[in-house]
Amino acid sequence: MSILVLADHDNGQLAGATLNTVAAATQIGGDIHVLVAGDSSGDVAKAAAAVAGVSKVLVAADASMNHGIAENVAPVIQGLASGYSHLLAPATTTGKNIMPRVAALLDVMQISDIISVVDANTFQRPIYAGNAIATVKSDEAVKIITVRSTAFEAVAAEGGSAAIEDVASGNDSGLSSYVKSELSSSERPELTSAPIVISGGRGMQDGSNFAMLEKVADKLGAAVGASRAAVDAGFVPNDYQVGQTGKVVAPDLYVAVGISGAIQHLAGMKDSKVIVAINKDDEAPIFQVADFGLVADLFEAVPEFEKAL
């Protein structure tokens, strides 16, 4: 049994979510190969070869593979599929774009966003915004799977010594083309990988009040997030959003400030190791999942918290 993992990367660095996906592959069992797509991905291939548990790295080195254009990458995976029992990718923007196309090309079902491996054919995934867990069994000859990275402990980034091989890259389909990327930059940790996250909700009342959270974040070395209500209200940009339609996080500490706790938000953060909630409404749903709760006016509690740090 062999497993192919699609590497998530930016042509310079291997994304951490790939290490979590390899961890899921390890639980399935079998030889683990990693596919790196991109014409300037030599450093990424070397990093993938060093990942613990990986026995081979395949490199599709062609300009058409750059930027993870699904219409170009999916046929390459299709061409490799016959040699594998499982095809895995992180449930990131890239993985969610490419893997359904691979499933369609192979005419097999996809199992999305798994959080647990029961056995080589059976997996668990959240449904109903995380309020229920579905156990899904697949009898397909090739299983197409996306992995929720926060559900699996990352394997070691070093210790492996996999062989690196080139594979046929295919041609540019001409169906889509890369235009540009607009990347936000911050001195704070990336939201999905930060060990501490402090998020604000509609209770913040105004975008300028997020400065209170930023002061706390600066002292804790934390990332700043937000609920969809805060994003929709224009308090902060969309890339702050945590939840079912935003980013899924599972930090060591998650602090929810002025967030009521709609199920869509809980779906994106309920796997956090420790959850702290600050809200003046003692019946807010967020307190049902919080390990520690403070019923207080956030405009008094947060400044006091910041001064105490």
Language model regions located:
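N-terminal glycine-rich FAD/FM-binding segment characteristic of electron-transfer flavoproteins
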Residues: 1-309
